[in-house]
């Protein structure tokens, strides 16, 4: 049976997590194995800045357990530079690399710019250009995009509206696909910092459980408050709250 609530972090290769999460003396080539013994999913975040090669994606596929899932953040060239315009060539390049993950490729995240007002026509054309054999999530950083017209477009194309917590800004809870996607960037107004309290984690877990009740087949939760290793520590905590142990994470 597929895991209903999958918990992980945005990236795993952080030297400053040695001590708080990884063993202090862990080598760089040991980090992914350590991570996958505790979580069943990870969000590849560095692909936003630099797209890894297909060979690299394939190596990650081969180094992880059979049930492991990679979410991949799409290139900023698509979302920030081109602003979703004429995406065909950029999407082709992206998938020629990311498809190296094979069956372990999970949702693709498109994070839109924070100061770009709603453009429904651009979104409509972009959604129509997406290959149909993948799952997609959209993190809409400008609140102007929180509009019924956009939600309807996402629903029409079975794309998830990312529920996020970012520097005091939160997006609406709305299920627009058969899965849900949650990104937690930190509980404070300082980006990527701070540790969520147990009470705050329970609130976010309730969001995930609500998505399940609303019909979501799976909910992906990724922590991005990477300073001092808080992302990994919070991910472990909420995973335990959800009723999963480290040893169960990759047995589904």
Tell where the protein language model's regions lie, with residue ranges.
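Residues lining hydrophobic/aromatic ligand-binding pockets adjacent to catalytic sites
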Residues: 1-252
